[in-house]
Amino acid sequence: MDWFVFFVNSILFIVPVLLAVALLTLVERKVLGYMQLRKGPNIVGPFGLLQPIADGFKLLIKETLKPSNASPYLFFFSPVLFLGIALVLWSVIPVKYSVVSVNLSLMLIIGLSSLSVYSLLGSGWSSNSNYSFLGAVRAVAQTVSYEISLGLILLGVVLFAGGFNVEVIESSQSWSWLMFSCFPLFAIWFVSTLAETNRAPFDLTEGESEIVSGYNVEYAGGPFAMFFIAEYANIIFINLLSVLLFLGGSSPMGEFFPVNVLVVSLKAGVLVLLFLWVRASYPRFRYDQLMYLTWKKYLPLSLSFLVFFVVLLGVLDSLPPSSCFL
């Protein structure tokens, strides 16, 4: 019976994620179209609403090709691993019927997200292509570099909230969102999430003018669709995590279902639209600028904020209790 409940909860998580990914592909093309003074998809279905279904069907019926010199097992296992990690990450999101309940959910998120590096490296190496391998090396270096800053920011959030549980962090912002009290930290977090998800202007792993398409250049059909779904699922997830960590989660509506879900979805949708606005507005960075930003700017700033929070909490703990609270 427990396995049946686990299976049902997993399906209830996976299906909305896939639907959200399909909707995001349509919204992205529409938003970019209007920002570039064109209409975007408007042929398939009313107002182009069925365009994601047509795109998905097209990818599924395409032939799955493998380069003759590619490593067959790792070549096909890498997209499966990438998609699996992207979907498993959603299981720790605190909802009414969670798939798993972990006290150290934030640590689990950090650990699982770091595993995606192996799928990117495996796909680039197993393709036996120079473009794929260069894209994979870029992706690994970029992801590992920005994960350090993200980890330090998360430690600062943990110090403020007093726990590694996402639910504890969300409930600690019932009166004031962490974004207001630590806006510089939130700004660094937001830009780092752009780099972590390989989005513009940090999409150097898929630099069309340099390495064609990056680590997935040799993929087609179903395996390419797995990479595509995983990338967009990660975009939605990282913005949902930003809402829970910095924007108070379902605050100010509390835990009233389904109002809380609508509030969180609305906040995450606004952040996703910011992702799309950045893509439409800014050109791609050079690779040296990307690395300079994280190692020379964000890493010292994140570490400085963390040290400041530790010292501040130590000073506040050493102060005697005020007489007005006695």
Curated annotation (Swiss-Prot):
Gene Ontology molecular function: NADH dehydrogenase (ubiquinone) activity
Signal peptide (UniProt feature, chain positions): none
Pfam families for the chain: NADHdh
GO cellular component, one term: mitochondrial inner membrane
Membrane topology: Multi-pass membrane protein
Disulfide bonds: none
Annotated transmembrane regions: 4-24, 41-61, 73-93, 102-122, 148-168, 175-195, 227-247, 256-276, 299-319
Record's subcellular location: Mitochondrion inner membrane
Gene Ontology terms: biological process: aerobic respiration
Keyword terms: Electron transport, Membrane, Mitochondrion, Mitochondrion inner membrane, NAD, Respiratory chain, Translocase, Transmembrane, Transmembrane helix, Transport, Ubiquinone
EC number in record: 7.1.1.2
Reactions catalysed, as given in the entry: a ubiquinone + NADH + 5 H(+)(in) = a ubiquinol + NAD(+) + 4 H(+)(out)
Domain of life: Eukaryota
Function: Core subunit of the mitochondrial membrane respiratory chain NADH dehydrogenase (Complex I) that is believed to belong to the minimal assembly required for catalysis. Complex I functions in the transfer of electrons from NADH to the respiratory chain. The immediate electron acceptor for the enzyme is believed to be ubiquinone.
HAMAP family per the UniProt record, alphabetical: NDH1_NuoH
Family recorded in the similarity comment: Belongs to the complex I subunit 1 family.
Entry protein name: NADH-ubiquinone oxidoreductase chain 1
UniProt source species: Patiria pectinifera (Starfish)
